[in-house]
Amino acid sequence: MTNIRKTHPLVKIINNTFIDLPTPSNISSWWNFGSLLGLCLIMQILTGLFLAMHYTPDTTTAFSSVTHICRDVNYGWLIRYLHANGASMFFICLYAHVGRALYYGSYTFQETWNIGILLLFTLMATAFVGYVLPWGQMSFWGATVITNLLSAIPYIGSTLVEWIWGGFSVDKATLTRFFAFHFILPFIILTLAIIHLLFLHETGSNNPTGIPSDTDKIPFHPYYTIKDTLGALILILTSLTLTLFTPDLLGDPDNYTPANPLNTPAHIKPEWYFLFAYAILRSIPNKLGGVLALLLSILVLAFIPMLHTSKQRSMMFRPFSQLLFWMLVADFLTLTWIGGQPVEHPYMLLGQLASILYFLLILVLMPTASLIENKLLKW
């Protein structure tokens, strides 16, 4: 009798995805982040569901309801901080996942890569609307500043902003719709993640060498299930350590002050995972230019497959490209740091230089280095 996992219509899908999936034998721990992102998503949906049971999306009670969750709900404080810090873990895994794809040339899987970019945008939208929900000072002013950027769009800008606000300022209507968006978007992310996986399994995984590994595949289970379990345990341990010892480490103290439209915080800044894009936005003294640069800071990923000039797929054997890649990582971290600093000298100048370098590395220097490497190898 044939094994049920290979014949049953539903179990067969799970089998072909997580059990009998042929996987390259040499993929490193950098390939763990895909499954970790899946784990983060499940954790966020579950903690979010329990938070939604006690949260009220109304300007008069939103802040109080979050306080109520922390003080009066059984383990409410734990659920709330797991959810808040879970977002940070999500983005850490996400940036590592994208970084790995850039380093090893996984972006040549065109469909998988494009769905990934769509996932990144959806995730950023989810995190942004979620940050507005506690209705603290930074929630309110963050929502005001970021939604206001749309007014830079010629002709329809102002109408668009008022349409998103549901009035003439960020108010009750805005909070209610942001809660609705924050509830629905994770399920859209889940759907996109399944499509992402579907496209990946059409081609099979890449590996550190970038060379096709059809001749050397091993089953996903038990080899990579055990490897992913280790990654998952490290993620859970890190998440719990952060939540139980320093729950407010990555948050903003201003968000413990209820939203007040009459009092602007000294430094309006988003959560740490958006600071790099925020630094790029602030580097350009023109509103529309800043918005376009902000959009392009993520959208530039879509051009990377077209800018792949190397004859090799991975950066494993390309020292010049490796050097530029780590420069990009350092630049990303510099932008993140500058995004959290006040708009004054020397941060403004540093931010502008780091922003120019960011686009220069991706669009010019890396493709040029690849061509030089080809030349040196007489290819």
From Swiss-Prot:
Which sites bind a ubiquinone?
201
Q: Please list the residues that bind heme b b566.
A: 97, 196
Q: Which Pfam families match?
A: Cytochrom_B_C, Cytochrome_B
Q: Specify the protein name.
A: Cytochrome b
Matching Gene3D superfamilies: Cytochrome Bc1 Complex, Chain C
Q: Does the keyword Electron transport apply?
A: yes
Where heme b b562 binds, per the record, is at 83, 182
Q: Which InterPro entries match?
A: Cyt_b/b6_C, Cyt_b/b6_C_sf, Cyt_b/b6_N, Cytb/b6-like_sf, Cytochrome_b, Cytochrome_b_C_euk/bac, Cytochrome_b_N_euk/bac, Di-haem_cyt_TM
Q: How does it assemble?
A: The cytochrome bc1 complex contains 11 subunits: 3 respiratory subunits (MT-CYB, CYC1 and UQCRFS1), 2 core proteins (UQCRC1 and UQCRC2) and 6 low-molecular weight proteins (UQCRH/QCR6, UQCRB/QCR7, UQCRQ/QCR8, UQCR10/QCR9, UQCR11/QCR10 and a cleavage product of UQCRFS1). This cytochrome bc1 complex then forms a dimer.
Residues crossing the lipid bilayer are: 33-53, 77-98, 113-133, 178-198, 226-246, 288-308, 320-340, 347-367
Q: Name one GO molecular function term.
A: metal ion binding
- UniProt keywords, alphabetically: Electron transport, Heme, Iron, Membrane, Metal-binding, Mitochondrion, Mitochondrion inner membrane, Respiratory chain, Transmembrane, Transmembrane helix, Transport, Ubiquinone
GO cellular component terms, A-Z: mitochondrial inner membrane; respiratory chain complex III
State the protein's purpose.
Component of the ubiquinol-cytochrome c reductase complex (complex III or cytochrome b-c1 complex) that is part of the mitochondrial respiratory chain. The b-c1 complex mediates electron transfer from ubiquinol to cytochrome c. Contributes to the generation of a proton gradient across the mitochondrial membrane that is then used for ATP synthesis.
Q: Which PANTHER family match?
A: CYTOCHROME B
Localization per record: Mitochondrion inner membrane
Q: How does it sit in the membrane?
A: Multi-pass membrane protein
User: How many cofactors are bound and how?
Assistant: Binds 2 heme b groups non-covalently.
List cofactor names only: heme b
Additional info?
Answer: Heme 1 (or BL or b562) is low-potential and absorbs at about 562 nm, and heme 2 (or BH or b566) is high-potential and absorbs at about 566 nm.
UniProt family annotation? Belongs to the cytochrome b family.
GO biological process terms, alphabetically, are: mitochondrial electron transport, ubiquinol to cytochrome c
